[in-house]
């Protein structure tokens, strides 16, 4: 088992969201130019206000990819009836570039976990060609990554990474006596 896959299995990303796959492309997700997403690490929602920079490896500029960011734990991990909640989708990303070169078909929505610890998953799929994804999903709630990728003829995932986030508590004021 590869070291890229093991944390995805332990974190139940493979199983709950994605099927087993063999990573074949490098993907680096960075928030605020210095916070790199690592599997299973926790990030504060205040760091996630702006969409991340997502750098894609690959062999050449003639390969195109679709990036999907989703929350499989919405609205809460104990009752994820909105599984999966779609936070962002970018298609037609050329290999060896980053997501800013693609076509954003679902705008980035800041993660706002209310209850419990949520997993936020970035999954990258190789397209058969440019403009493989013809339409945006009708809703963000109850999105199904596997069904979507199958419908548009996308590959199995070629890369994935996830982080955890939970609601930030407000600073408590000390009582004045």
UniProtKB/Swiss-Prot annotation:
SUPFAM superfamilies: PEBP-like. It is found in: Cytoplasm. One of its GO terms (biological process) is flower development. One of its GO terms (cellular component) is cytoplasm. PANTHER family: PHOSPHATIDYLETHANOLAMINE-BINDING PROTEIN, PROTEIN BROTHER OF FT AND TFL 1. May form complexes with phosphorylated ligands by interfering with kinases and their effectors. This is Protein BROTHER of FT and TFL 1. It comes from Arabidopsis thaliana (Mouse-ear cress). The gene is BFT.
């Amino acid at each position: 088992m590869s070291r890229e896959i093991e944390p995805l299995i332990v974190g139940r990303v493979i199983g709950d969201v994605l099927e087993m796959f063999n990573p074949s492309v490098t993907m680096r997700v960075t928030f605020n130019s210095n916070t790199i997403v690592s599997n299973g690490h926790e990030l504060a929602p205040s760091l996630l206000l702006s969409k991340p920079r997502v750098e894609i490896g690959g062999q050449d500029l003639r390969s195109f990819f679709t990036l999907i960011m989703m929350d499989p734990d919405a609205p809460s991990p104990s009752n994820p009836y909105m599984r999966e909640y779609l936070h962002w989708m970018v298609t037609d990303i050329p290999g060896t570039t980053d997501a800013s070169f693609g076509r954003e078909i679902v705008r980035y929505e800041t993660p706002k976990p209310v209850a419990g610890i949520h997993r936020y998953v970035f999954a990258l799929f190789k397209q058969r060609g440019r403009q493989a994804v013809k339409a945006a999903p009708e809703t963000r709630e109850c999105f199904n990554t596997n069904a979507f990728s199958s419908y548009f003829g996308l590959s199995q995932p070629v890369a994935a990474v996830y982080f955890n986030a939970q609601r930030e508590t407000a600073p408590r004021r000390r009582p004045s006596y």
